[in-house]
């Protein structure tokens, strides 16, 4: 039995899809365990970009099983669209399995997401307006509709009528907005359910059987640790648990069956939306990193905020996710800079701290304490071994590993599969 969890260690967009795709070559089952279509991942195969939001990266390996776990919230309309996109590109989806326990995102979730965000005014949290939060709210309130319910027409009708009655009271009375008409969505979404029916199964059984039979299982997280609802920069977080612990809840696999946790990070930091970001850059260096790194959201298209590598954030992520290995991406983006910086601690009201505060007010007052390293000018996109990196780039990689306290198993010098280099196999 070997199972590996891939988690983002920053605020998402670290290149998890690329690393999952890379590690999938040696896995037999690939599963997602949380989130929805609010997070996008981009995979480059033979120079062609594929952008996915719901379906695991392993779908590009037809001989492997790809799983949408019970911890996800699934917009059936988005899922059917994504399946059609893959079919048009010649990608088979016969290897997809969808948990019958996953919850369903419906139009009223998206509308409520929009209205709640608008009502916050200047205190917006930067939601993607995909209905993720309201769907998880319904799940916690025990009024959610699951995939299993969607497939049964009578049950779906009864639960949709009940939920719409409640949500429409909110829309009309609280938000002074239009009600959603039952007939406008019932048949449409029931039909989506019928289109995905052949993929639906108890995925916990599949995953546990695979592990019990010695197969390699890869768990793919969405977003990142710093967006975790418990461990992230609350309330500027997502509504689920991207941390490695989320696997056990979101997949139905017990914690004793998790072997390794790979933390994915970039050689710098980025985030989309509002919230604390101690190392954020507002100068020409930040603009250069954004442009060279193509830092625009896969889902929203919004320019990402960028900053220097933050080892305080990384140590927090290592601790709360039990990270055993690190995948360091986008080293090439820093090429051409005379000096590169790493945040090693914060100055909080004149006191040096090496932990990430829970208080937003304290975070606002935190000033990064940097360690400066000499940069490198060489084009490193063709490098295939650590020893072939320029000395300064090599020193940067080693310093990142030292500060985070985790060994680096892969490093990447570009978006392609062939640009990910192995230092140590996580499957051994």
From Swiss-Prot:
GO cellular component, one term: cytoplasm
EC class of the enzyme, as a word: ligase
SMART domains attached to this UniProt entry: Adenylsucc_synt
Reported cofactor(s): Mg(2+)
Residues reported in the UniProt entry to bind GTP: 12-18, 40-42, 304, 330-332, 412-414
Compartment(s): Cytoplasm
InterPro entries assigned to the protein according to its UniProt record, in alphabetical order: Adenylosuccin_syn_GTP-bd, Adenylosuccin_syn_Lys_AS, Adenylosuccinate_synth_dom1, Adenylosuccinate_synth_dom2, Adenylosuccinate_synth_dom3, Adenylosuccinate_synthetase, P-loop_NTPase
Amino-acid positions noted as binding IMP in the UniProt annotation, renumbered to this chain: 13-16, 38-41, 128, 142, 223, 238, 302
Principal localisation: cytoplasm
Record: residues binding substrate: 298-304
Gene Ontology molecular functions: adenylosuccinate synthase activity; GTP binding; magnesium ion binding
Binding-site list for Mg(2+): 13, 40
Disulfide-linked positions: none
Record-level GO BP terms: 'de novo' AMP biosynthetic process; IMP metabolic process
Cofactor-binding details, from the entry: Binds 1 Mg(2+) ion per subunit.
Catalysis: reaction(s): IMP + L-aspartate + GTP = N(6)-(1,2-dicarboxyethyl)-AMP + GDP + phosphate + 2 H(+)
UniProt KW keywords: Cytoplasm, GTP-binding, Ligase, Magnesium, Metal-binding, Nucleotide-binding, Purine biosynthesis
Pathway as given in its UniProt record: Purine metabolism; AMP biosynthesis via de novo pathway; AMP from IMP: step 1/2
PANTHER family according to UniProt: ADENYLOSUCCINATE SYNTHETASE (PTHR11846:SF0)
Record note on quaternary structure: Homodimer.
NCBIfam families (UniProt xref): PRK01117.1, purA
Similarity section: Belongs to the adenylosuccinate synthetase family.
Protein name per Swiss-Prot or TrEMBL: Adenylosuccinate synthetase
Native species: Streptococcus pneumoniae serotype 4 (strain ATCC BAA-334 / TIGR4)
């Amino acid at each position: 039995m070997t199972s590996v969890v891939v988690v983002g260690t920053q605020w998402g967009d670290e290149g998890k899809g690329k690393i999952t795709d890379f590690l999938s070559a040696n896995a037999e089952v690939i599963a997602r365990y949380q989130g929805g279509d609010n997070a996008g991942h981009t995979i480059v195969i033979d120079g062609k970009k594929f952008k996915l939001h719901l379906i695991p990266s392993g779908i590009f390996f037809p001989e492997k099983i790809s799983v949408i776990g019970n911890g996800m919230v699934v917009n059936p309309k988005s899922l059917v669209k994504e399946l059609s996109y893959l079919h048009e590109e010649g990608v088979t989806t016969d290897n997809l399995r969808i948990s019958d326990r996953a919850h369903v995102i419906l139009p009223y979730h998206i509308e409520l997401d929009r209205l709640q965000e608008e009502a916050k005014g200047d205190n917006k949290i930067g939601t993607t307006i995909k209905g993720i939060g309201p769907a998880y709210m319904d799940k916690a309130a025990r009024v959610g509709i699951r995939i299993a319910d969607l497939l049964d027409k009578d049950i779906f009708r009864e639960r949709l009528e009940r939920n719409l009655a409640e949500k429409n009271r909110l829309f009309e009375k609280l938000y002074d907005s239009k009600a959603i008409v039952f007939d406008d969505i019932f048949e449409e979404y029931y039909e989506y359910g019928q289109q995905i029916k052949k993929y639906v199964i108890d995925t916990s059984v599949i995953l546990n059987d695979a592990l019990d039979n010695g197969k390699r299982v890869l768990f793919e997280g969405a977003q990142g640790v710093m967006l975790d609802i418990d461990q992230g920069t609350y309330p500027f977080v997502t509504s689920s648990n991207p941390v490695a612990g989320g696997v056990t809840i979101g997949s139905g696999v017990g914690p004793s069956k998790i072997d390794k946790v790979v933390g994915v990070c970039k050689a710098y930091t980025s985030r989309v939306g509002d919230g604390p970001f101690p190392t954020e850059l507002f100068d020409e260096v930040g603009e250069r990193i954004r442009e060279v790194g193509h830092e625009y959201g896969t889902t929203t298209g919004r320019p990402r905020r960028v900053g220097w590598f933050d080892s305080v954030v990384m140590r927090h992520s290592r601790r709360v996710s039990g990270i055993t290995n690190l995948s360091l991406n986008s080293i090439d983006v820093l090429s051409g800079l005379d000096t590169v910086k790493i945040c090693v601690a914060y100055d909080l009201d004149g006191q040096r701290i090496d932990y990430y505060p829970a208080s937003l007010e304290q975070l606002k007052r935190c000033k990064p304490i940097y360690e400066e390293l000499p940069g490198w000018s060489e084009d490193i996109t063709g490098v295939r071994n650590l020893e072939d990196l320029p000395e300064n780039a090599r020193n940067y990689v080693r310093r990142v590993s030292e500060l985070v306290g985790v060994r680096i198993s892969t490093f990447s010098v570009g978006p392609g599969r062939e640009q990910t280099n192995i230092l140590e196999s996580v499957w051994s």
